[in-house]
């Protein structure tokens, strides 16, 4: 974004100094603490020995988070001291996620319903989109390893009017204002990963971009022209936009390669895409695919997202 702006181009998205909201979990946790935005209790560590010592007195389960970007896989939920010690060693000492693991956030484990809320931001004004609920486990019945997301639906039945009002008062605008006060004006998309706990909504994480597969159920329900909304964010006129969504629901199921998220083969031909031609209200979103002479083939872990 910085490079484009330096070249005199209009671009939608946060500058580097604002994208740190997602780029560093330690930064975002410290920001929430400073400005009173509700989140889980936590400590930051850049010394693995101090992290290991802290775990000796911690309550379990506990959550370990690599500070930097780790393709959505840098979060470990540890039920025992031994699991947590192994997590610290693999992330901080063995550098499983490279420099993303130089600093680690260790935070309390929160229970409740997870909800995702995407929003447009123009630096001052924030307009939230409809809610979505993501399912991260690789296998049916909420089993298996955590992934980048295996499917999602929108809206979330747990995101009630009361929850929305609380988040508007204590989380959404507060985050935008906090970034502005820090001299890091945020323009673009803020994705709020929320946990609806018995004590009220808490922020799990921020992303500085659309969620995948959340965008695949939220955007098809949006009535506005997306380009007009993005231009309003760039121009700082988002307050003049009336963001509207269809009063319906959408579901997205991710088709993934066998063995994802651990190891999987690529290069299988995908058949049946033509069945979606002229089908209104059905979408196939490509992710890990590649065009070849023999047709479109699988080329990643999460291959397609099918939305209805």
Provide a role label for each language-model segment.
Residues 11-14, 41-44, 62-66, 77, ...:
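General beta-strand structural signal in soluble alpha/beta enzymes
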Residues 74-217:
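Internal nucleotide-binding/catalytic subdomain
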Residues 1-23, 37-46:
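A short, GP-enriched loop/loop-strand-helix hinge that lies immediately N-terminal to
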Residues 152-155, 253-254, 302-308:
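Short, well-ordered beta-strand elements within core beta-sheets of diverse protein domains
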Residues 289-292, 298-308:
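Generic C-terminus detector
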Residues 168-190, 207-279, 287:
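Active-site "cap" helix and flanking loop/linker of ATP-utilizing ligase/carboxylase catalytic domains
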Residues 139-141, 240-242, 289-296:
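Short beta-strand/turn micro-motifs at beta-sheet edges
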């Amino acid at each position: 974004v910085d490079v484009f702006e330096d070249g005199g181009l209009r671009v939608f998205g946060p500058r580097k100094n604002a994208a740190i909201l997602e780029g560093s979990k330690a930064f975002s946790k410290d920001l929430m603490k400073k400005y009173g935005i509700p989140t889980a209790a936590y400590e930051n560590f850049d010394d693995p020995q101090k992290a290991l010592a802290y775990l000796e007195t911690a309550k379990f389960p506990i959550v370990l988070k690599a500070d930097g970007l780790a393709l959505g896989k840098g979060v470990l939920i540890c039920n025992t001291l031994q699991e947590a010690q192994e997590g610290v060693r693999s992330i901080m000492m063995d550098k499983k996620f490279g420099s993303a693991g130089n600093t680690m956030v260790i935070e309390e484990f929160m229970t409740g319903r997870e909800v995702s809320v995407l929003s447009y931001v123009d630096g001052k004004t924030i307009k939230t989109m409809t809610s979505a609920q993501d399912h991260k486990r690789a296998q049916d019945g909420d089993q298996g390893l955590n992934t980048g997301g295996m499917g999602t639906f929108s809206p979330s039945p747990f995101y009630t009017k009361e929850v929305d009002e609380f988040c508007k008062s204590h989380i959404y605008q507060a985050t935008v204002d906090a970034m502005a006060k820090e001299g890091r004006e945020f323009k673009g998309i803020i994705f709020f990963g929320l946990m609806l706990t018995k004590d009220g909504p808490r922020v799990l994480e921020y992303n500085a971009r659309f969620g995948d597969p959340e965008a695949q159920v939220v955007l098809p329900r949006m009535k506005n022209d997306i380009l007009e909304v993005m231009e309003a964010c760039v121009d700082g006129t988002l307050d003049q936009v009336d963001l509207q969504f269809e009063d319906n629901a959408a579901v997205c199921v991710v088709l993934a390669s066998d063995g994802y998220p651990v190891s999987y083969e690529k290069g299988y031909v995908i058949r049946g895409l033509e069945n979606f031609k002229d089908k209104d209200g059905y979408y196939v979103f490509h992710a890990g695919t590649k065009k070849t002479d023999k047709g479109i083939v699988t080329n990643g872990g999460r291959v397609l997202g099918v939305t209805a």
